[in-house]
């Protein structure tokens, strides 16, 4: 898979936001946390991930390119907050009260667990499954688990086990 090139100006905007929010946190908390490593290798529909032990933030390059400033304003502080909470409080729920406090009171950003970016360009292929009451689209990962007999999925409405609907060939 070839990686997307993130323009230097966009990388610099990410780093400006990261450094500004980190400075706010260090001043507010009386700490001197180092700058986390940033990479642009996040895949799928996730906008970003925080790697706690390695103090690293992984950002989705496609969603960054498609949503530039809103992405920087929301996702960079969101992932930074995870790292700071881990350093400050240890292992706590990922979007718990400590994380919300870090987002709103320290980083001064509204605490939102999920992004609202369009994901059609990064959504993976889905497979059709059916129950008694409706059709379901399973991701390739879930489909493969069903095919290998490792998992089964049930409808939340009727409780019936989902059955794969094979595509008809002519």
From Swiss-Prot:
A GO MF label: zinc ion binding
Active site: 79
Keyword Transferase set for record: no
Pfam hit, one: SprT-like
Listed Gene3D superfamilies: Metalloproteases ('zincins'), catalytic domain
SprT-like domain boundaries: 23-165
Any one cellular-component term (Gene Ontology): cytoplasm
Name the UniProt record assigns to this protein: Protein SprT
Species assigned in the record: Yersinia enterocolitica serotype O:8 / biotype 1B (strain NCTC 13174 / 8081)
């Amino acid at each position: 898979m070839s990686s997307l090139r993130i323009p230097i100006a966009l990388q610099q905007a990410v780093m400006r936001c990261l450094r500004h929010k980190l400075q706010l946190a260090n001043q507010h908390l009386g700490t001197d946390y180092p700058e986390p490593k940033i990479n642009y290798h996040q895949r799928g529909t996730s906008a970003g991930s925080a790697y706690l032990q390695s103090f690293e933030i992984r950002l989705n390059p496609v969603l960054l390119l498609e949503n530039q400033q809103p992405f920087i304003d929301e996702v960079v502080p969101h992932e930074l907050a995870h790292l700071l909470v881990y350093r400050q409080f240890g292992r706590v729920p990922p979007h718990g009260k400590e994380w919300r406090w870090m987002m709103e009171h320290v980083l001064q950003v509204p605490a939102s667990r999920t992004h609202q970016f369009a994901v059609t360009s990064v959504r993976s292929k889905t497979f059709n499954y059916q129950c008694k009451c409706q059709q379901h689209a399973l991701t390739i990962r879930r489909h493969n688990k069903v095919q290998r007999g490792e998992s089964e999925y049930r409808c939340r409405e009727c409780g019936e086990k989902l059955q794969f609907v094979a595509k008809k060939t002519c």
